[in-house]
A protein has these predicted regions:
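Beta-strand elements of modular eukaryotic interaction domains
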Residues: 1, 41-43, 79, 89
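Aspartyl protease active-site motif detector
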Residues: 1-32, 68-71, 78
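Pepsin-like aspartyl protease folds
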Residues: 9, 27-50, 75, 111-114, ...
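Basic, gly/Ser/Thr/Pro-rich low-complexity segments located predominantly at protein N termini
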Residues: 11-13, 44, 83
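Aspartic protease core domain of the pepsin/retropepsin superfamily
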Residues: 54-138
Length: 138
């Protein structure tokens, strides 16, 4: 997932994971609201609702995400969404060997990001959908 400081919302491609996970309607999807994409594309990207994903990174850190679902090419995590969930997001300019990360202000949960091809990515495994979405992670 690309960590995007310019994204207004976190969004995932509709066909990224087809495991029976439900897509929940949102006010925006019900109203047919679309989002302006970055770049030269002029057509709005329609909000199709949201899904919940439970994630585990390579360090064993668990979290969850509720991205909007849309006709996008790759998953984006908005820095603003991380901030709204209580994470401070750090992209160090010094000590280039220090990874970028997001640290939760209440419980110190830390999500570590990799810099690849000039962008920051959060490398995770998506946990299989079990039909039970009650588990809540920071």
């Amino acid at each position: 997932m690309t960590i995007d400081s310019g994204a207004g919302i976190s969004v995932w491609p509709r066909d990224l994971i087809n495991d029976g996970r439900p897509t929940e309607s949102t006010a925006e999807s019900l109203l047919g609201i679309g989002y302006a994409p970055a770049g030269a594309q002029s057509a709005l990207i329609k909000d199709e609702g949201k899904r919940k994903y439970h994630l585990v990174d390579r360090f064993g850190q668990q979290t969850s995400i509720n991205p909007r679902i849309a006709g996008v090419r790759k998953p984006l995590v908005a820095v603003a969404d991380l901030n709204d969930r209580g994470f401070d997001v750090i992209f160090p300019a010094t000590l280039r060997r220090t990874p970028a990360y997001a640290k939760h202000t209440a419980d110190n949960t830390t999500l570590t990001f990799d810099r690849r091809n000039q962008v920051y990515e959060y490398v995770v495994n998506v946990q299989p959908f079990t039909g039970n979405d009650r588990q809540v992670a920071p």
